[in-house]
Regions:
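Alpha-helical transmembrane segments of multi-pass small-molecule/ion transporters
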Residues: 1-309
Length: 309
């Protein structure tokens, strides 16, 4: 228990620090957008390639992990549709509930998994991301298409998925690993320094994107989406990992990813495709704040449950 709390509190401390820094105008509004771009397009991809290329992937059960990820997305979708009568005020609002129920924050996930589980955490997390990001984007686009009836920008989504730097870097890292090429020794010291920058800057950017003002008008929606994403999803992940006989450490990484708050990019997708962007912003902020308590709690609870079985 102490180990989990000790490992996770710096992650959430950096998120809060990012929030405080932006609200106090430090180091300037223009900094945060550029910081997020640098993290997303350079620092995180370098981290993923370097870790995946050098990690022993024989300890990762790719088949079981893939099946668990697909089933988790399906279960999250079912949960979201089941609570629809109790939540969204309109069709656009439901798209925000849906995204809040299934998507996950990559920055928090990579930082927490690296802190808790080291290279194995990054490796399993990268496999989860490589599978889940395209699948979730496809599901979200289908939900938007059905509920908002907007088609103008949907053609750009497949290309955006293919060009996603996190997917590309995961595939490059896995290729270097599986072909035996490994990571080039010449650039390894540079990659190591860039990798160390990725997690703190990414977490600061998450905090900088939070806004408490948006929480005022979406209380019911935040509660339902958070209940699904932060409680039902990790419990479902626990059951699936048990069902497929996944090793304990890989299972813990999957629990963690299932328990993550929804992605900050959900707001952008809601704005682009006709969803309820203010509600989405409220869910992102609410879940990020709640997850500071829920993630340590659920990880400790599931760890205890696993040992008792």
């Amino acid at each position: 228990m102490i180990e989990i709390i000790s490992a996770l509190w710096p992650v959430f401390a950096l998120i809060l620090l990012g929030y405080v820094a932006r609200r106090t105008g430090f180091p300037g509004e223009s900094f945060w957008q550029q910081a997020e771009k640098a993290t997303y397009f350079v620092l995180f991809p370098v981290l993923l390639v370097s870790r995946l290329a050098t990690t022993d992937m024989s300890v990762v059960d790719l088949k079981a992990t893939g099946l668990i990820v697909c089933l988790l997305v399906l279960m999250g979708s079912v949960f979201a549709f089941l609570v629809r009568p109790f939540t969204a005020r309109d069709a656009a609002g439901f798209t925000s509930i849906y995204q809040g129920s299934v998507r996950f924050n990559v920055y928090v996930g990579l930082a927490a998994s690296a802190t808790l589980f080291g290279s194995l955490g990054v490796a399993v997390g990268a496999v989860v991301m490589a599978l889940m990001i395209p699948l979730l984007n496809l599901c979200c686009v289908l939900v938007f298409s059905f509920f908002t009836h907007k088609t103008g920008k949907f053609s750009a989504i497949p290309l955006a998925i293919i060009k996603n730097p996190l997917i590309i870097s995961s595939l490059i890292g896995l290729t270097l690993n599986q072909t035996g090429i490994g990571f080039p020794l010449v650039i390894e010291p540079v990659a190591e320094l860039l990798s160390r920058m990725a997690l703190p800057l990414g977490l600061l950017s998450v905090g900088a994107g939070l806004s408490f003002r948006v929480l005022l008008n979406s209380g019911v929606e935040i509660c339902w989406a958070s209940f699904i994403k932060l409680m039902l999803m990790p419990l479902s992940a626990f059951g699936l990992c048990l069902l497929f006989g996944l090793d304990s450490q890989s299972a813990e990484v999957i629990w963690l990813y299932a328990a993550l708050p929804t992605a900050t990019s959900s707001y952008i997708l809601a704005r682009q495709l006709g969803g309820d962007a203010p509600m989405m912003a409220a869910i992102v902020t609410g879940q990020t704040l709640i997850s500071m308590i829920s993630i340590p709690f659920i990880m400790i609870f599931l760890g205890f449950l696993q040992k008792s079985l």
